[in-house]
């Protein structure tokens, strides 16, 4: 199959390599033409995925039109807040009939839209049954080294979800399917915010009790928002929910946990972001999800605390005190 992967960061590069290793003809699009030329010449992404060599069937290009033209499937792997701009750039190209698989995790600032909603908004000819999300506990560094990984392909159309499953599934990259794309996308987006909170706990020096509480109560927040938006709370117990939440809150590879840890140690957000090589999606997602939850009347205190620490300069100690001194209540409320 001819596949276009849009976005040459660590995850886009990893998936392009995985697909090429499986025998697909893959074009990896890089936003900056000079970066595309460097990757094509060096046959390795030393900036984002050092040590993973490109298979012969992987071509890196800077021409979006040429990348899309032959593709039967398009994988969008650009940062979540850049997805609208990218989709708009190929909205006039012949994408009809192609399956579009989004792998970026986030909620758009301003609109409060999930990533597949952004795609539908910018691509009027895109049918809901031709779009999918591929989410789950899947750090690029481990997938690139072919360490066992499981994810879920979700689409309103089971036929599309199964088509994505067939394209991506390998003996080291197991793909499940479901049709609850709302639950999958909400879980994959909010977990990054909860991971920032988990990182803050690490940075301050709190123990396992605090981390367990953040993960568990974070799951409750994800479930409440997913249910309000029409998702199935049971999805949160799956790979895109608890699976991705645990790995993002605990892993040394997690950018979002790293941001939180550095905040907990006293560094400013601006300083952390300036010196990071990659994007931590949870930072801007906290702004989008807090606004969305507030407008819907969904209580998400951990999300609110992260937002206030990141964007309202609320002291970490005060945010923790506010969380711990909230009115006592039943666990399932």
From Swiss-Prot:
The keyword Lipid biosynthesis applies. Its EC number is 1.1.1.94. NADPH binds at residues 10-11, 31-32, 105, 140, 255, 279, 281. Pathway: Membrane lipid metabolism; glycerophospholipid metabolism. One of its GO terms (molecular function) is NAD binding. It catalyses: sn-glycerol 3-phosphate + NAD(+) = dihydroxyacetone phosphate + NADH + H(+); sn-glycerol 3-phosphate + NADP(+) = dihydroxyacetone phosphate + NADPH + H(+). Sn-glycerol 3-phosphate binds at residues 105, 136, 138, 191, 244, 254-256. GO terms for cellular component: cytosol. The keyword Nucleotidyltransferase does not apply. The active site is at 191 (proton acceptor). Keywords: Cytoplasm, Lipid biosynthesis, Lipid metabolism, NAD, NADP, Nucleotide-binding, Oxidoreductase, Phospholipid biosynthesis, Phospholipid metabolism. GO terms for biological process: carbohydrate metabolic process; glycerol-3-phosphate biosynthetic process; glycerol-3-phosphate catabolic process; glycerophospholipid metabolic process; phospholipid biosynthetic process. It is found in: Cytoplasm. HAMAP family: NAD_Glyc3P_dehydrog (MF_00394). Catalyzes the reduction of the glycolytic intermediate dihydroxyacetone phosphate (DHAP) to sn-glycerol 3-phosphate (G3P), the key precursor for phospholipid synthesis. PANTHER family: GLYCEROL-3-PHOSPHATE DEHYDROGENASE, GLYCEROL-3-PHOSPHATE DEHYDROGENASE [NAD(+)] 2, CHLOROPLASTIC. Belongs to the NAD-dependent glycerol-3-phosphate dehydrogenase family. This is Glycerol-3-phosphate dehydrogenase [NAD(P)+]. It comes from Chlorobium luteolum (strain DSM 273 / BCRC 81028 / 2530) (Pelodictyon luteolum).
């Amino acid at each position: 199959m001819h596949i276009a992967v849009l976005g040459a960061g660590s995850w886009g590069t990893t998936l392009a390599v995985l697909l090429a290793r499986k025998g697909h003809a893959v074009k990896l699009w890089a936003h900056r033409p000079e970066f595309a030329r460097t990757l094509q010449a060096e046959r390795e992404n030393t900036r984002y995925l050092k040590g993973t060599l490109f298979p012969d069937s992987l071509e890196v290009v800077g021409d979006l039109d040429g990348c899309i033209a032959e593709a039967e499937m398009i994988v969008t792997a650009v940062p979540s807040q850049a997805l609208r701009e990218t989709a708009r750039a190929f909205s006039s190209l012949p994408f009809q009939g192609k399956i579009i698989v989004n792998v970026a995790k986030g909620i758009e600032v301003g609109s409060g839209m999930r990533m597949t909603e952004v795609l539908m908004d910018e691509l009027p000819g895109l049918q809901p049954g031709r779009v999918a999300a591929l989410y789950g506990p899947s750090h690029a560094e481990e997938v690139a080294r072919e360490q066992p990984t499981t994810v879920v392909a979700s689409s309103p159309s089971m036929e599309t979800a199964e088509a994505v499953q067939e394209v991506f599934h390998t003996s080291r990259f197991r793909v499940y399917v479901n049709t609850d794309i709302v639950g999958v996308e909400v879980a994959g987006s909010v977990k990054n915010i909860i991971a920032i909170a988990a990182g803050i706990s690490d940075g301050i020096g709190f123990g396992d009790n605090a981390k367990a509480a953040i993960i568990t109560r974070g799951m409750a927040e994800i479930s409440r928002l997913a249910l309000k938006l029409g998702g199935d709370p049971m999805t949160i117990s799956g790979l895109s929910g608890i699976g991705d939440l645990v790995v993002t809150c605990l892993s040394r590879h997690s950018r979002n946990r790293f941001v939180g840890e550095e905040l907990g140690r006293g560094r400013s957000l601006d300083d952390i972001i300036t010196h990071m090589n990659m994007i931590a999606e949870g930072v801007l997602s906290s702004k989008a999800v807090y606004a969305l939850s507030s407008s819907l009347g969904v209580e998400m205190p951990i999300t609110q605390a992260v937002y206030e620490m990141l964007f309202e300069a609320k002291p970490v100690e005060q945010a923790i005190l506010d969380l711990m001194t909230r009115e006592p209540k039943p666990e399932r409320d």
